């Protein structure tokens, strides 16, 4: 139980900016981090929904509310995944050979493609959130979207070939196996079912579309880069959540 508590502490510290008591790193607890990744999604999702609830009670104008809601998950995660999205976008959009793409991925310099990509992403995501608010949809979906994205991310990290030898994602994979993969896939199915029974079919379609786009992105990245790492996981997570919001704005 103590190991599990440490794992929760470590997971929250790694993937959020939520202040926590100091702790000592424990390699035995690290193997549980990916299984707890959906829990991080739950925390972020609840805080995301609460931000909407508070803003709506304050009668904040819809356009401003959409902009503020957009920032919440990025702020809570310290822009960790958005940074990965920018790095991978820069590499993939360069249209260079595999070795050059990998070199670009490791380069800390902010490239033009990454800037263009993040600006377009945030503009369209803002429009999506604004549309969802304007359509008066059930905003409890904000709880489920981060859980789904992090569940699939955890599954990819424990099941896929790692990119590079020094990847932190590779460290998280150590000590995991088929049981972890089954648990994470089971959680995704559970999230989909709860979404359907509490919110309805349109919201289920959004969750399933997030899963579909994640596999499409995974295949693309594996083809062009050869595997997955922390940046790739962030890239997939950001586009999964973007897909969920965008689809709700359309259907």
Swiss-Prot record:
Keywords: Cell membrane, Cobalamin biosynthesis, Magnesium, Membrane, Transferase, Transmembrane, Transmembrane helix. GO terms for molecular function: adenosylcobinamide-GDP ribazoletransferase activity; cobalamin 5'-phosphate synthase activity. The chain crosses the membrane at residues 36-56, 60-80, 110-130, 181-201, 202-222, 231-251. Pathway: Cofactor biosynthesis; adenosylcobalamin biosynthesis; adenosylcobalamin from cob(II)yrinate a,c-diamide: step 7/7. Disulfide bonds: none annotated. Its EC number is 2.7.8.26. It is a multi-pass membrane protein. Belongs to the CobS family. PANTHER family: ADENOSYLCOBINAMIDE-GDP RIBAZOLETRANSFERASE. HAMAP family: CobS. This is Adenosylcobinamide-GDP ribazoletransferase.
